[in-house]
Design a protein with these regions (language model features):
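Carbohydrate-interacting regions of secretory-pathway proteins
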Residues: 1-128
Length: 128
């Protein structure tokens, strides 16, 4: 996955992640394009194994938007996550801190879940 707005000393609990693992490995709030463990993607967007996926991520204040392969997958206001370990829909998540209280700035990180993964052509533009 792509960690963002994260603390490198505590990436899993100290920031956010958009999942980019193989489409067949996970489902729901862990599938390609999800805000990991917090929000499933709006549409299925992952390509089959062996094909490159693209991602665009935009974060401004409490707004987080993401596209995978040109399809809008996340468009949310993180201030809606007001309780630790709980999503706005009432389902549980792994976060010990309410997501609205996580940093609005931080580091990027690239992660894998035990299988080979490749990244290329990474571009970062400052917001404005």
């Amino acid at each position: 996955g792509l960690f963002f707005r994260t603390d490198p000393k505590n990436a899993v609990q100290g920031g956010f992640e958009i999942q980019i693992a193989s489409p067949g490995l996970y489902s729901g709030k862990h599938i390609v394009g999800s805000l990991y463990d917090a929000k499933e993607p709006m549409v299925a967007a992952g390509k089959p194994d062996g094909e490159w996926n693209t991602m665009e991520l935009s974060c401004k204040g409490s707004s987080i938007k993401a596209k995978v392969n040109g399809k809008k997958v996340i468009d949310l206001n993180i201030d809606d996550w007001t309780e630790p370990n709980k999503n706005p829909d009432g389902s549980k998540n792994k976060f010990k801190t309410a997501l609205k209280n996580l940093p609005r700035t931080g580091h990027f990180g690239l992660q894998y879940h035990g299988q080979p993964v490749w990244y290329r052509k990474i571009k970062i533009k400052p917001g404005g």
